[in-house]
Amino acid sequence: TWIGAIFGGAILEPLIGTTKIHHDPNRFQYLGSANDDVYVCLARKDAPVKKIEDAMTTELIVGASMASSSADFATMLNHEIHTKFREVVGYNGSRPIMLAMEKNEVQGACGFAWPSINVTNPNWFGPEGMMRVLAQTHVKGYPALNAMGIPLARDFAKTDEEREVMDLYFSHTTFGRPYLVAPEVPKDRVEALRKAFMATMTDPEFIIEAKKAGLDIDAVDGPEVQRLIGKIYAASPDLIAKVKRALQPDP
């Protein structure tokens, strides 16, 4: 049995993306996801924006890559909660954006997965760090960030429509690193693989080794991933069209 490992964005792309991907993610059988990726917006502490509400009245210059989460999340928030993120698009990936933030070429960024950036750049955060987290672009949020009082961007929606648009787009981050098998794989084998997947993801020794490698494990089981994907693909054409519009930068 072949097992596929993809990014969560590849599941959403056929529905709302601009590229012509010819597959139906809803047909596959999902074993689970290694991560529930909570994406965040960040700002340098010396920037004029100290909290997400400030970004609704004060411009924040953010770094972004073309057709990436760093661009999409900032654009989405500009449309749905009326932030004033001014995107500097053209950075070739997340590392150049991080370097630009450190050099103060840009004042912040959106579309960074907290479980990853907190591991790779732990010195950025905390009382002596140079960065602050403005908001979580996620439906539920990361427990540690919730405990710190970091708000969810969706909570600043002024209408149900704005909230629904964000929720549909943000939902794909719940399955950040999904694993899948083909539609024809027998159900009993899928069930066995799902159990084995979660047993691995929750094994204490595996988690220790993952942390040594700088990987954060926050697994989501197969049935939940399957349910979420089914819900996304059951969205109305009207809502999907609104999400597409919200991902289009202003001219």
List each model region and its residues:
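An extracytoplasmic/periplasmic, membrane-proximal ligand-sensing/linker region
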Residues: G129, V133-L134, F156-K158, T174, ...
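Conserved hydrophobic/amphipathic secondary-structure segments
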Residues: T1-G176, A241-P249
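Active-site acidic-Proline motif in GNAT/NAT acetyltransferases
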Residues: K45, A182-P183
